[in-house]
């Protein structure tokens, strides 16, 4: 019988509130979600038994927390990481770095094959009857543990960091899809697996719908104040896909995960992602994890000798299934790095809980077995990040240059190429020259690459769009707009185009393309010289100009400026946070994702950039 008293909810919320405070007070370096499960053990069946398990409030909020956790798991998948392995890189030891996607794919295939073999071992030993479910449990990897650990160690953008991240991303995607297949095969509506295609088709339609409307001006204007249309759209998407997945006989968490993947593909702004994280990890998800601990009865588990024997064996299987495939990296990395990577990839939590819960609901495994699997996941998530930090020795990475490509060599672009600092940028200039201009080109001080034409096929075959920044500045405005839109469609992160007409300007801005023109630049410069000559002096001063730094180091998240360890003559001029522009003062707190406008000597600014961008 369901209870509607809020007393149990109050207990759970107080515990969820106190958990991170206690972790901080006692300086315990374990994931907060693991600590929440442990606190649930203390107040639940295994401990003080303060929570009524059948409480309606808790059941509803816990289920919503589970759904939102799966949504955020999908949202955590950074699809741009699949593109980061194309450029040739060199490791600190001088070896050429492996292609991150290829290496991650090989490692995951190894993990999956080994997990399958180990699963059959558990079946033959009589611990479990379903090898499919056990394969998913052994092969899964927790993005929720991997991503914060990589960020904390500031190796997210390194070659090894990207490989670890990609393995976790591929494992997350593959496990979730296979979990949906498992649910369809062993559920009440088994044999209707083709219905899942309807869910994925709906996801594709919703993705293109979102892509069309994302940059519309009315959407931008409705994303502020009390409307927050972006947040409303995301919650609507979650509920629609959850309802659709349930109506098709699939698990509701598949719909939530798909919603997260779709939002991630649409590249939401960081401010919106932070809002969703704050809501999820600040309210619903802690309730879910505390309730996971509340429902676990470890004393009953420990009375089962089979479970007691299986727990250490499963922990060993988790380690073996990750460390052996990671040995593939031995030709590039030392043993400490390989073992550290294997330990971090062993961390597993949310999808194990999902798999165990679904397995129990489908009567594939018992309640005790479900509890044992969750307990193993908790233990693994406690010690594996600690082992990673102990084993991994961070080597200084060579400063990675940004690549910038100019299409069009003219009086605007060529002087800029000489002024960009060589230690920060690899510059490439391409241009279509007339035959009678070849001699002048050979005598020029500028390094310009001659191409036959600006056709789409030509530009793509030359790898023009595989650059960090693309500046399109040919003499033809229509061509500039066309190439800029193509580049954005091909995935170029930053595109700058030279256009002057209002029609082109509006269309390009909707796609997130920066624009410039001689007329606009001249008007802006003249107005600045008239109204604020001091600002123009600051902008054009080579020694102390304005610089943008992206705040990406979680170590300084929440630090107030007066306590920030500034060096030299660096001054914070402005902070851009989402759509807000903040005038900084001593009590201003830095936040992840901030774009900082600073001024000062180049050397000190470079040091600050290394500190905050890692």
Curated annotation (Swiss-Prot):
Start and end residues of each RCK N-terminal domain: 401-519
GO MF, one annotated term: antiporter activity
Localisation: Cell membrane
Domain of life: Bacteria
UniProt domain RCK C-terminal: residue ranges: 533-614
GO cellular component, one term: plasma membrane
Alphabetical keyword list: Antiport, Cell membrane, Ion transport, Membrane, Transmembrane, Transmembrane helix, Transport
Gene Ontology annotations of biological process type: potassium ion transport; proton transmembrane transport
Its membrane topology: Multi-pass membrane protein
Annotated TM spans: 3-23, 32-52, 57-77, 107-127, 130-150, 163-183, 193-213, 225-244, 248-267, 282-302, 307-327, 338-358, 368-388
Protein activity control: Binds cyclic di-AMP (c-di-AMP), which may regulate the transporter activity.
Role this protein plays: Probable Na(+)/H(+) antiporter.
Family indicated by similarity: Belongs to the monovalent cation:proton antiporter 2 (CPA2) transporter (TC 2.A.37) family.
Name by which UniProt lists this protein: Putative Na(+)/H(+) antiporter YjbQ
Organism per entry: Bacillus subtilis (strain 168)
